[in-house]
């Protein structure tokens, strides 16, 4: 099956719009845009103007989608060897590399121009740096070079709250950086839980994820330690007076559940514990930012 998928990379049919949509990783981009919206809202006591909100989300969304499409393009041969990614458009031959390149470049340029012209140059360049960080630095180099790939490369994926903040303020301020640090610290336990679940896939594709290079048990220890660190970082918005009791109670519950998953994965795992932790981590981040928003306006 994998050899057929590999051969299909050069055999394309008429692309369906769903193939292009899949290139953009819409669920990932939706989560990124949620964090960007929260960044915007926390930057002001007033409601965010639609004149800022619409072009900012359009530009950030398009450039995030472009980065995702480049990731599909660069990783197409790796994806053909992994069960989780085998059905993506490029391994299946639904799209050609040339079409994906054109698509990514087009939406990336439109996104940058939108931010530069209708939001502000600072946000445009920061979003561009984030796109390059993920699509080039992480995907092309770090992912293939070091088991710390997602630790270093995670900074690019953590940028959207800052991008939302600068869309409103045109400044980089400490609260926005703290929001970035929450996602940056969240990223390793999120991805390493998936890597533990899919360790054989990554080994087959020769991707040096931590479970492949250092073993499952070492990775579980790192996941637990990073989850403890995440718990501390998540408390910082309350400790510095950025949020109130609604956030403290909500994030404490989320952190307790996340820590419970990390503990179980380390000391009494079942077959599905790693994947369940990965799945919950997405809810953790999404709900954390929703709680930030509720706390800000209530």
Swiss-Prot record:
* Leading EC class: transferase
Q: Which GO terms describe its biological process?
A: heme O biosynthetic process
UniProt pathway: Porphyrin-containing compound metabolism; heme O biosynthesis; heme O from protoheme: step 1/1
Tell whether Zinc is among the UniProt keywords: no
Membrane-related topology note = Multi-pass membrane protein
An example of a Pfam family matching this protein is UbiA
Under which EC number(s) is this enzyme classified?
2.5.1.141
Alphabetical list of Gene3D superfamilies matching this protein: UbiA prenyltransferase
The family note in this entry says:
Belongs to the UbiA prenyltransferase family. Protoheme IX farnesyltransferase subfamily.
Name of the protein described by the UniProt record: Protoheme IX farnesyltransferase
Which organism is this entry from? Idiomarina loihiensis (strain ATCC BAA-735 / DSM 15497 / L2-TR)
